[in-house]
């Protein structure tokens, strides 16, 4: 639970931005298809993906559910689901704390086939306990 009265101004700004981010992809969550990508009972990380029906936009939530005995968690890529194999996508990390720099190459592009066959590593770790990725189709 978040105790708002105990948050710093910077933390309050982060919460406001997180709500704006959520609003930008809430229709994908409410009306899209949901895929469980990683089982938290078998992995220290849980990952859930939502994809809109047109397969043009997606959002992936990956978060640490267990910290036992490990300092780096997502060594293996996560195989995405529900994308169009032929479409080309760009991945953007959202919900970064002010001043934090993503470890993800946000300029790279991937085919849906690549993301579903070979996957993508969101780089979840003890320092990055939660990663939110927006995946959008691009036209070249």
Predicted feature residues:
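Active-site-proximal substrate-binding groove within the catalytic cores of carbohydrate-active enzymes
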Residues: 1-100
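C-terminal beta-sandwich/jelly-roll accessory domains of carbohydrate-active enzymes
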Residues: 66-140
């Amino acid at each position: 639970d978040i105790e708002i009265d105990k948050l710093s101004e910077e933390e309050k700004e982060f919460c406001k931005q997180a709500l704006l981010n959520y609003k930008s992809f809430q229709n994908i969550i409410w009306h899209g298809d949901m895929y469980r990508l990683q089982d938290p009972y078998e992995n220290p990380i849980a990952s859930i993906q939502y994809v809109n029906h047109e397969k043009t936009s997606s959002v992936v939530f990956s978060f640490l559910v267990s910290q036992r005995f490990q300092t780096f968690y997502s060594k293996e890529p996560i195989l995405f689901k529900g994308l169009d194999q032929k479409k080309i996508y760009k991945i953007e990390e959202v919900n970064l704390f002010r001043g934090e720099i993503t470890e993800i190459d946000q300029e790279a592009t991937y085919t849906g086939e690549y993301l579903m066959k070979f996957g993508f590593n969101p780089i979840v770790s003890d320092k990055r306990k939660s990663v939110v990725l927006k995946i959008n189709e691009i036209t070249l």
